[in-house]
Amino acid sequence: MSKGFLVSLEGPEGAGKTSVLEALLPILEEKGVKVLTTREPGGVLIGEKIREVILDPSHTQMDAKTELLLYIASRRQHLVEKVLPALEAGKLVIMDRFIDSSVAYQGFGRGLDIEAIDWLNQFATDGLKPDLTLYFDIEVEEGLARIAANSDREVNRLDLEGLDLHKKVRQGYLSLLDKEGNRIVKIDASLPLEQVVETTKAVLFDGMGLAK
């Protein structure tokens, strides 16, 4: 058993996970919580190199299984190099995407076999799952509109996908929510950022047993 607490942030494109995390960090630090924030794909040098390959807008011919295996490879390296040591040190680790993204994007979105994805996730993580997953839910059209309106956000290959894929991804997340409601908590990401941050803070503090 790890000593720390692992939280993953999940959601469709444009749900605002990163903005919420940026707002939460000073609140957690004020509480004296030792926290590590990181992202998938990426987080470490090898992972970031793989991220570049996955998200390069010019890589339009990437096969779905190739995409999945690249994510899994990045996940493994990230885990052993950064996440596990932080958990062993007793830190709160907050990951911007983790195992559920593979199920939602490559499983539901790309139509790959869910059982195969579950096996690969198990293989890459040695069975590690988040203690808590915060799922930021938003209508697909609204999320993509946010991306289009944000000139500072770098457009990646997944942003260029058709509406159909993104709708399947959201359905994948909602399916995971039904299946693992004890781990995954749904947060309405369509609300103003301040409200989303407050809700997220309350859910996180409750999950960690921290005083609000």
Curated annotation (Swiss-Prot):
E.C. no: 2.7.4.9
- Superkingdom is Bacteria
Q: MF terms per GO, please?
A: ATP binding; dTMP kinase activity
Q: Which residues bind ATP?
A: 11-18
Keywords of the record? ATP-binding, Kinase, Nucleotide biosynthesis, Nucleotide-binding, Transferase
Read off the InterPro entries from this record: P-loop_NTPase, Thymidylate_kin-like_dom, Thymidylate_kin_CS, Thymidylate_kinase
* Family (UniProt): Belongs to the thymidylate kinase family.
Q: What is this protein called?
A: Thymidylate kinase
